[in-house]
A protein has these predicted regions:
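Bacterial N-terminal signal peptides that target proteins for export
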Residues: 2-17
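Hydrophobic h-region of N-terminal signal peptides that target proteins for export
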Residues: 14-16, 20-29
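Low-complexity, Ser/Thr/Pro/Gly-rich disordered linker/stalk regions
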Residues: 30-112, 116-119, 126-138, 147-152, ...
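Extracellular/lumenal carbohydrate-interaction signature centered on repeated Trp-anchored short motifs
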Residues: 85-94, 162-169, 177
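Tryptophan-centric aromatic hotspots in well-structured domains and transmembrane helices
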Residues: 97, 115-117, 176-178, 185, ...
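Short, aromatic/His-centered strand-loop micro-motif at the edge of beta-sheets
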Residues: 150-171
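Localized edge beta-strand/strand-to-loop motifs within extracellular or lumenal beta-rich domains
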Residues: 168-184, 188
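Short, solvent-exposed beta-strand-to-loop segments that form ligand-recognition rims
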Residues: 190-217
Length: 257
């Protein structure tokens, strides 16, 4: 009887381990690739954070003009989100995103993220990352705009500048310029290559740069998702269009001056 119980427990353990492996694989299922802004991006699928949310390949596509569409969809009673990640890691330089969409009118539970993010060999969640996010984090009284720099060391605090804004139209440009000593954030009205029509700007320049600003190349992420996995309060699907992504290495920025 004892031997039967042992074998039974081992069989159940094998089943639980196998199920865990299957669930883990489902959460990090590799997605198909898409070409945008001169880079190859992997489209996310499966389920996981942030949120957590479900992520669907069908929520990402290019139109005939090679504009990138990201969508939060509601199908068969379930909500799903969109995320893409560059296959290549990028380092110091200017990261610029041109967006079509009324980001100032997002539902309180909608988040648009434009950011780099550490792979496991670079650091853990909550480190190294540089974020531009448009979100009210579920609270209608919060500002919509958020610039954030995460420290190199997990024990340190991130620094964030949040800001309110209203737009005259649906075209905006957002960028961060990252080097060893500072990060400059800018949000501008229209599709721009210059510094005109800035509606928000922040320079993050800490004293201990080696502890607060990463120097490690990282993939770029663009995602459109639901805060804590909550459906939009207005019950509507959300779509954002990116006209372009452009990365300019730091060495080329110096030559442009």
């Amino acid at each position: 009887m004892f031997r039967q119980r042992v074998f039974s427990c081992l069989a159940r353990l094998r089943m639980w381990v196998a199920a865990g492996i299957l669930l883990a694989c489902a959460a990090i299922a590799p997605g198909k690739d898409i070409e945008f802004g001169g880079y190859t991006w992997q489209i996310r699928s499966g389920r996981g954070g942030p949120g957590p949310n479900s992520w669907a390949e069908d929520n990402v596509w290019l139109d005939a003009s090679t504009n990138l569409h990201l969508k939060i969809s509601h199908r068969d009673g379930h909500w799903s989100c969109a995320e893409i990640t560059t296959r290549q890691r990028l380092g110091f330089g200017r990261y610029q995103f041109q967006i079509s969409g009324r980001i100032d009118c997002f539902d309180d539970n909608v988040v648009l993220g434009l950011f780099n993010y550490p792979t496991s060999d670079v650091g853990s969640d909550g480190t190294h990352e540089i974020d531009i996010e448009f979100a009210r984090w579920g609270n209608a009284h919060n500002p919509m705009g958020n610039f954030t720099v995460w420290p190199v060391e997990k024990s340190l605090q991130r620094e964030t500048k949040s800001f309110r804004f209203g737009l005259p139209g649906d075209q905006t440009t957002h960028r961060f310029i990252w080097n060893r000593t500072q990060v400059l954030f800018q949000s501008l009205v229209g599709f721009r290559e210059d510094d005109q029509e800035i509606f928000s700007q922040w320079v993050y320049r800490p004293k201990e740069t080696d502890r607060y600003i990463s120097d490690r190349p990282m993939p770029v992420h663009i995602n459109l998702w639901l805060f804590q996995g909550r459906p939009p309060k207005n019950g509507l699907e959300v779509e954002v269009v990116l006209r372009d992504f452009k990365f300019t290495p730091e060495s080329q920025l110096f030559r442009l001056r």
